Structure formats: structure tokens, C-alpha cells
């Protein structure tokens, strides 16, 4: 992608996602995610009905009249976007690639966070962590994240989700909102999901193209795994073969859903042709 094409694409995503964000998601996001507790705001004279435990005894003694501490919700949060950049994510049979779809969802989440003055960071991973953008605030930062997702070099390697999670937990000690984007084509250590969800608020997003789950009838054809480089001939005209493939994909999805449920983490299965804003809205409502 040339620079002018990147700029154009980022701008298009910003226009589309900000409209969706402002119309539906931002309010739900604010309501759904609570901050890290209460923080001190100011001291003022005591008023009837104020809680006794809020009295500032030092200032009360000094001025010989009661003063109370005013507390406010500490709203600032950190959102981390973990994006799989293995080669299978650079694929799509619809109007956009999986990576482009991820960039749109990331933009919606990012602008929702920015609207609430929260920080957003990015980790790109495949077989290892390839890039980290530390959490920051603001529109320009979100646009930089979108551009990074769109222009990343997608890696012909098996994705190691558990390594990315372990890395994230090693550098972010404070509870964060963690959104994990992948097609989950490769194996991972489910124990890491449980460890991560105990500390962070975790949502896994399986991004898939409708052709990921089915193989068309095109006779004998050479199937190629973009991540491992393996090739195998298959008779796609065989109804039994196509059925076995489809059932294996369904079983993989069921196991994935169970892993997240058993880890007390949230999970979404999102087709690149679907309206992700409705799914996010429903997710925020349930939090």
C-alpha cells in the first residue's frame, strides 16, 4: 500500500467508525467499564446528609468546623489491543481483508476509549511479539494504531497467542481492558486465558471469513497453509471430505468457546461480513 492509499484508508475508517461510535457505542462503553476505584477530588464544608466517614479530621480540627473529602470515580482505564498478524489474517473473500476488518473494530473501540479519556495501546504478534505501541490518549494516537494494523507485515508463522498474553501481563500490572483479535487457527495454552482473565477484563474476538469454514467443490486441488507453508492435495468434490472439514471447524469453534467460558473471559465469533457495532453494543450492555 502506498502512503496516499494508507492515508485515504485510515481516513475512511475514521469517518465510518466515529459515526458508529458516537451514535451507539460511546455511552455504552462509559457505562460498562468502571475505573480503578475512587480518588480524592476536593475538600468542602460539611453538609447535612454527608457521610461521617468522609470527614477530613485534620482540616476539621484546624478550622474548628467539619469538612468532608469529596471523592470521584477514577474513570481512566487502559485498553490494550492484541492483534494477530500471522499470514492467515491477511486474507478475505469479501470486500475487505480480516486485517482491515480488525482495524475498523479497533478504531471503534479506540475512539470509544478516547471519548472517555482512556489510554489505548497495541501489541502485534504472531510467533512472537513484533511491535508494541504504549498506551496513550487522543485521536491522533488512535489513527496511528489504525495505520499500524493496516500496514503491518503479516508473518508466515504459527501464531502464539499465549506468548502475546504472557508478554502483555508482564508489562501491564494494573487491570486493563484487553481485546484479543485472531482467527485462532493455531493451538494455544488455555491456562494463559485463565491467568489473564483473573487480572484483566478479557474479550477474545475470532475474526473469520465465511470461506474459512467451508471448502468449495473445485475437484482435486492443492491446499496451502499460509502460516506453516504446508501443502496437501485434497478431493474437494468429495461430499464426505467437505463434511468432515466443516465438522472439524465447528468442533474447533466449540472448544474455543468452552476455553473462554471456563476462563471467565468473554468471546465473540465475528464474520467479516457482519455488523460488529451491534455485537459490541450488546457486549457493553451486558457488562
PLM features per residue range, with description:
Residues 1-33, 42, 167-174, 192-287:
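Von Willebrand factor type A / integrin I
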Residues 126-130, 186, 274-276:
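Short, internal active-site loops enriched in acidic
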Residues 181-188, 202:
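Active-site glycine- and acidic-residue-rich loops that bind
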Residues 141-176, 188-189, 209:
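Von Willebrand factor
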Residues 58, 154-158, 180-182:
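Short, flexible loop segments at the rims of nucleotide/cofactor-binding pockets, characterized by
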Residues 132-147, 239, 258-261, 285-286:
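Short, electropositive alpha-helical surface patch
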Residues 1-130, 135, 177:
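An amphipathic, basic-hydrophobic helix/alpha-beta surface used to engage anionic
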Residues 80, 123, 179, 203-205, ...:
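Hydrophobic/aromatic beta-strand patches that form the interior of the parallel beta-sheet core
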Amino acid at each position: 500500500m502506498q502512503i496516499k492509499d494508507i492515508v485515504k484508508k485510515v481516513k475512511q475508517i475514521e469517518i465510518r467508525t466515529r459515526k458508529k461510535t458516537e451514535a451507539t457505542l460511546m455511552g455504552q462503553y462509559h457505562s460498562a467499564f468502571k475505573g480503578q476505584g475512587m480518588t480524592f477530588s476536593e475538600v468542602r464544608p460539611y453538609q447535612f446528609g454527608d457521610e461521617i466517614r468522609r470527614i477530613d479530621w485534620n482540616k476539621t480540627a484546624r478550622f474548628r468546623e467539619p469538612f468532608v473529602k469529596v471523592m470521584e470515580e477514577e474513570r481512566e482505564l487502559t485498553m490494550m489491543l492484541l492483534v494477530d498478524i500471522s499470514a492467515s489474517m491477511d486474507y478475505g473473500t469479501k470486500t475487505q481483508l480480516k486485517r482491515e476488518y480488525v482495524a475498523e473494530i479497533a478504531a471503534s473501540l479506540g475512539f470509544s476509549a478516547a471519548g472517555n479519556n482512556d489510554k489505548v495501546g497495541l501489541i502485534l504478534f504472531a510467533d512472537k511479539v513484533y511491535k508494541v505501541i504504549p498506551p496513550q490518549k487522543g485521536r491522533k494516537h488512535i489513527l496511528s494504531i489504525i495505520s499500524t494494523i493496516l500496514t503491518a507485515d503479516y508473518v508466515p508463522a504459527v501464531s502464539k497467542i499465549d506468548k502475546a498474553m504472557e508478554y502483555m501481563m508482564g508489562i501491564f500490572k494494573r487491570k486493563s481492558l484487553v481485546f484479543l483479535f485472531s482467527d485462532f487457527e493455531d493451538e494455544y495454552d488455555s491456562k494463559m486465558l485463565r491467568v489473564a482473565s483473573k487480572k484483566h477484563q478479557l474479550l477474545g474476538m475470532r475474526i473469520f471469513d465465511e470461506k474459512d469454514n467451508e471448502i468449495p467443490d473445485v475437484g482435486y486441488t492443492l491446499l496451502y497453509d499460509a502460516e506453516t507453508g504446508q501443502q496437501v492435495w485434497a478431493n474437494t468434490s468429495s461430499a464426505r471430505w467437505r463434511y468432515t472439514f466443516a465438522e472439524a471447524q465447528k468442533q474447533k469453534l466449540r472448544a474455543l468457546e468452552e476455553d473462554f467460558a471456563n476462563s471467565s473471559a468473554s468471546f465473540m465469533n465475528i464474520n467479516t461480513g457482519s455488523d460488529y457495532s451491534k455485537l459490541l453494543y450488546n457486549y457493553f450492555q451486558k457488562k
